[in-house]
């Protein structure tokens, strides 16, 4: 298969086409050197069994096990029909097969077997290789076998993520069925697009992209839930206390559920992140955001604000809202870094208050911090109008 630069036997083809990309294949015959990958079949299976998390997600591991058990073929490592590339040192008629060259770069770029770089001992073995599912075979069969042959340690984990599909098929520049990410980022902001991609699709699986799903996710999660919570919280602090909460506060048993969720959020978030379950990690954050919005309805701060004797209680309610934002703000910063910074500015939190360590503690910011209202971070958009705009080829 020319686009994939892969060699296949007739038995490996799927309906006579490339099993990876579905494209046409061509019969080819040329002199080549081979790496005896088949020698490592049993050793690879044993390694998978002893290191069950080596290939992620688990469905990908099952695919690789099945591939080996049907008969692992030796790997062609040189070409004579291609002139560009690195020459085989002992036979200049041959150039090194591009994937052998590419895979070896993981260690040679760190200094393995050369005097140019000196970071091999520091950085190898890698904690994780993050690759597309279409090149998983190279990273979990050929590459580990090469490392075994060199008596070198394997990377700790290889994660093969799925494709983002459009109209049921893989996006392809050659087919013209692609979504312009620059256009989306210019229109909605890179944070919103990044959030959608990681929240909408379980990482590692296939996911369908539609303009409607993008806009609905932005409107529901970012504009309605997070954006509205930020706007309401800061505006009430400004309205009732001039932007600065007093030190005197009055807690109530109805605060306990929300405070408990805020305090336990970081541990739940970390658990999902460690498993590369980014969708679940963000879901945990937005559970707290949703509960905080419900807490506003339960405590009715607008009613408390009308009674001077309940100012301390009002201060406590608003403080809990700001605490929720302070804790929920930095956790999604790997997905939405500018948004985390903007939230910090509006709720009057310092860099230390918004550090990654701070979500593990409740009651961090001082009472005297000043909050100020800013422009909507995620403006709500009209679904029909936005879809028409996105589907307009001249827009």
What name fits each language-model region?
Residues 53-54, 73-74, 81, 152, ...:
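Intrinsically disordered or highly flexible coil/loop and linker segments, enriched in small
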Residues 14-16, 50-51, 91, 114-123, ...:
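Short, glycine- and charge-enriched coil/turn segments that flank and shape catalytic ligand pockets
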Residues 1-12:
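Cys/His-rich Zn2+-binding cysteine-cluster or related metal-binding knuckle/ribbon modules and their
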Residues 102-105, 225-236, 261-264, 268, ...:
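Alpha-helical scaffold segments in carbohydrate-active enzymes
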Residues 1-3, 162-164, 213, 248-253, ...:
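A glycine-rich phosphate-binding loop feature that marks nucleotide/adenosyl-phosphate handling sites
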């Amino acid at each position: 298969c020319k686009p994939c630069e892969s060699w296949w036997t007739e038995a490996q083809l799927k309906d006579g086409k490339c099993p990876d990309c579905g494209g046409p294949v061509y019969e080819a015959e040329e002199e080549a050197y081979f790496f005896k990958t088949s020698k490592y079949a049993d050793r690879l299976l044993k390694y998978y069994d002893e290191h069950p998390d080596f290939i992620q997600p688990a469905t990908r591991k099952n695919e690789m096990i099945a591939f080996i058990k049907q008969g692992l073929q030796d790997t062609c490592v040189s070409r004579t029909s291609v002139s560009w590339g690195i020459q085989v040192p002992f036979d200049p008629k041959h150039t090194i097969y591009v994937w052998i060259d590419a895979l070896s770069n993981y260690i040679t770029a760190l200094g393995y077997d050369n005097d140019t770089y000196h970071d091999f001992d520091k950085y190898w073995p890698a904690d994780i290789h993050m690759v597309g599912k279409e090149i998983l075979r190279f990273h979990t069969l050929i590459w580990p076998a090469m490392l075994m042959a060199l008596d070198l340690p394997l990377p700790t984990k290889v994660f093969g993520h799925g494709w983002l599909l459009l109209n049921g098929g893989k996006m392809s520049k050659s087919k013209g069925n692609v979504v312009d990410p620059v256009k989306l980022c210019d229109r909605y902001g890179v944070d919103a697009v990044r959030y959608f991609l990681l929240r909408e699709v379980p990482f590692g699986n296939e996911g369908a992209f539609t303009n409607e799903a993008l806009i609905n996710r932005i409107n529901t999660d970012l504009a309605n839930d997070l954006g509205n919570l930020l706007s309401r919280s800061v505006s009430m602090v400004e309205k009732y206390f001039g932007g600065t909460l007093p030190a005197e506060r009055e807690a109530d048993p109805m605060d306990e559920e929300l405070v408990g969720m805020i305090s336990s959020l970081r541990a739940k978030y970390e658990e999902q992140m460690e498993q590369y379950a980014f969708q679940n990690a963000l879901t945990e954050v937005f559970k707290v955001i949703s509960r905080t919005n419900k807490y506003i309805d339960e405590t009715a701060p607008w009613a408390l604000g009308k009674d001077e004797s309940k100012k301390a209680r009002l201060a406590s309610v608003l403080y809990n809202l700001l605490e929720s934002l302070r804790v929920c703000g930095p956790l999604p910063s790997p997905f939405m870094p500018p948004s985390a910074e903007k939230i910090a500015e509006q709720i009057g939190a310092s860099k230390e208050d918004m550090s990654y360590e701070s979500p593990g503690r409740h009651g961090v910011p001082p009472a005297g911090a000043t909050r100020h209202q800013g422009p909507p971070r995620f403006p709500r958009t009209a679904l029909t109008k936005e879809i028409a705009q996105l589907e307009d080829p001249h827009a």
